[in-house]
Amino acid sequence: MSSYSSDRDRGRDRGFGAPRFGGSRTGPLSGKKFGNPGEKLVKKKWNLDELPKFEKNFYQEHPDLARRTAQEVDTYRRSKEITVRGHNCPKPVLNFYEANFPANVMDVIARQNFTEPTAIQAQGWPVALSGLDMVGVAQTGSGKTLSYLLPAIVHINHQPFLERGDGPICLVLAPTRELAQQVQQVAAEYCRACRLKSTCIYGGAPKGPQIRDLERGVEICIATPGRLIDFLECGKTNLRRTTYLVLDEADRMLDMGFEPQIRKIVDQIRPDRQTLMWSATWPKEVRQLAEDFLKDYIHINIGALELSANHNILQIVDVCHDVEKDEKLIRLMEEIMSEKENKTIVFVETKRRCDELTRKMRRDGWPAMGIHGDKSQQERDWVLNEFKHGKAPILIATDVASRGLDVEDVKFVINYDYPNSSEDYIHRIGRTARSTKTGTAYTFFTPNNIKQVSDLISVLREANQAINPKLLQLVEDRGSGRSRGRGGMKDDRRDRYSAGKRGGFNTFRDRENYDRGYSNLLKRDFGAKTQNGVYSAANYTNGSFGSNFVSAGIQTSFRTGNPTGTYQNGYDSTQQYGSNVANMHNGMNQQAYAYPLPQAAPMIGYPMPTGYSQ
C-alpha cells in the first residue's frame, strides 16, 4: 500500500554540490570586510490570498498502525524515551513500511540494511508527513537527517514542477559546511532514486558551480546562512517556491551568531510554509526561535528532558593540570592505538593549539592530522577524507568539527581542552557512538574549567556514569576559594594508589572493559576508586601489554620487533601506529600514511616526504 505518488521525472540534469562554511572568516560574503549580511534583503509583505495554494498533508495512517492501541503506543514511547508535546500528534511508526514511502525510497532503505526506524524517525515521520510544524530535540547520531529528508521528498513530489527561474521547494539551513556536506551526501542518494535534484551552497568554495546548479533548478537546497544570503542579495536564487523549511542544529546556528541571517532568510519565505526545527539542546534562545517561526508545532524530545549525553558513550574524566596533559595524552594514545578500532578525535580549544599538537604528534610518529577554521577548504576536505578512510586515524580538531562531523566508526573522543559549555561537551562526545554503536570519551578537566564543573557532574549523573571524586572536590574548593593551583587538588598519589591497588585496574582500557561488562552499581563504585590513577608508570609494567611493553614514554615504548600481549592486534613488526625511533627518519619520512598530491594546497604543519613541496 502506498498513499504517495511515485517518483516524478523532473527532466533536468542533477545538481551537484558539497557544503562549506556559511560565512567567510573575513566577514560577510557580500564583498565587504564588515557589514550587515542581508541588509539588501527587504522583508516581504505576504498576502496569502494571492499566493498559489499548495498541499502539505499527505499522511494516511497504515492499517497496522491504526490497530495499535493507545497503551501500546505509550509503551513504545516510554521504551524509546520519546516525549511528545502538542495537539493531535500522530502515532509513531514501528516499521518502515508503515510510513508508506514511495517504492524507490523503500528500495534505498532496504539497500542500506536498516532494520527499524530510530526513535526520532518513528515519531517524526508521521508528524512531518502530516504537514505539521515540529521541533525535534535529539542527540547527535540519532538519524534526524532522514527524519526530515524523506518527508521532504514526499512533499516535493506533490508540488508542481519547477519552472525556469524558480528556487528550491525544500530549503535546509545548516550551521557549518561539514554538516551541510553530509546532508547533501545523504540527500543525493535518495534524490537520485527519485529523479530529483539537490545541491549544496556554502562559503569558502567557488560560487560558479553553485550558481549553475541553482540556475538549472533544484528541488532541495542545503545551505549555510552566509552564502545563501549572498546569493539572495545578488539575485542568483529566490525562495518564492520554498514551502518546506528545515533548520538543522538550530542551537549551533544561534551559538555561531547566525540568528540575524536566519531571520533575514525566513522573511523571504511564505508564512504558510511547513517548518521543521532540529536541535540537540533546548535552551531559551532556541525556544524563542521556535515560537517566532513555527505555528501550533509538535515538540518531540528523545531522551531526558534535561541536558543529556548519549548513554552509549562511556565518559571518563581525568582531573589534572595543564602541564600534565601532553604526557597523559601520549599514554592514552598508546593504549588506543593498540586497538583494532582506534579512530580518535582529539578536541582542542584554539587553532594554534591544534597546529602545535598536530606537529608534535606527527613529529613523534603518530598518524595525526589537524582541522580548524583557518584551513583551506581543499585541505579540510582532504584531511577529513584521510580520517574517514583510516589513513590517519587521529584527528585533532577545534569546535569547527565538533558538529556535523559524521564518521560512523569513531571509537574514541578526547577532550584535550574542555569546551566552554556543557552543550559543546555533549556535541563533542557525540562524534562517537553514532546510531546504536558504543564509544568512549576521555576528558582532561583542569581547575581552570571550574565554572563548568557543576554542569559536567549533572551530565555524568544523568548518563549514570562514574563521577571522579576530584570533580566533587572541585565543587567544594570552589566555595572555599581553593580551586586554583595545585593546592586545590589532593595528592595524586592517593588516586594512583586507589587505581592500582584498590581498583585492581592497570589501564584506562581495563577501566572501560570493566564498565562495559558490569552493572551500573559496580560501575559507580569502581569510578569512585579508579579515575585519574591510570597513567602512572607502575600501572603499565607487567600489565595487559605483555612483558615487552616498557612505559618509559613514547620513544621507548616498542623495544622489540614483535611485541607481545595486546599490541599483537594484526600489526606487523614495524608497528604501523607505533613510534619506534629506529623506524622514523626525520619524524615522518618513513611513515606509511598518505600525503596530498603535489598540486594540492600547501599543508603547512604536515612534514612532507621528498618530492612534495610545502
From Swiss-Prot:
Classification lineage: Eukaryota, Metazoa, Chordata, Craniata, Vertebrata
Molecular function GO labels: ATP binding; ATP hydrolysis activity; mRNA 3'-UTR binding; nuclear androgen receptor binding; promoter-specific chromatin binding; ribonucleoprotein complex binding; RNA binding; RNA helicase activity
Chain positions recorded as ATP binding sites: 114-116, 121, 138-145
Organism expressing this protein natively: Mus musculus (Mouse)
Cross-link type Glycyl lysine isopeptide (Lys-Gly) (interchain with G-Cter in SUMO2), residue numbers: 32, 45, 53, 340, 343, 388, 391, 411, 437, 451, 470, 523
Summary of subunit composition and partner proteins: Identified in the spliceosome C complex. Component of a ribonucleoprotein complex containing mRNAs and RNA-binding proteins including DDX5, HNRNPH2 and SRSF1 as well as splicing regulator ARVCF. Interacts with RBM4; the interaction occurs in an RNA-independent manner. Interacts with AGO1 and AGO2. Interacts with ESR1, AR, EP300, CREBBP, POLR2A, TP53, RUNX2 and HDAC1. Self-associates. Interacts with DDX17. Interacts with BRDT. The large PER complex involved in the repression of transcriptional termination is composed of at least PER2, CDK9, DDX5, DHX9, NCBP1 and POLR2A (active).
Protein name: Probable ATP-dependent RNA helicase DDX5
Entry function: Involved in the alternative regulation of pre-mRNA splicing; its RNA helicase activity is necessary for increasing tau exon 10 inclusion and occurs in a RBM4-dependent manner. Binds to the tau pre-mRNA in the stem-loop region downstream of exon 10. The rate of ATP hydrolysis is highly stimulated by single-stranded RNA. Involved in transcriptional regulation; the function is independent of the RNA helicase activity. Transcriptional coactivator for androgen receptor AR but probably not ESR1.
Position(s), cross-link Glycyl lysine isopeptide (Lys-Gly) (interchain with G-Cter in SUMO): 53
Gene designation: Ddx5
Entry EC number(s): 3.6.4.13
Similarity field: Belongs to the DEAD box helicase family. DDX5/DBP2 subfamily.
GO biological process, any: regulation of skeletal muscle cell differentiation
Family matches, as PANTHER family: ATP-DEPENDENT RNA HELICASE DBP3 (PTHR47958)
Domain of life: Eukaryota
SMART domains: DEXDc, HELICc, P68HR
A Pfam family hit: P68HR
Phosphotyrosine carried by residues: 297
The Helicase ATP-binding domain, residue ranges: 125-300
Class of the enzyme per the UniProt entry, highest EC level: hydrolase
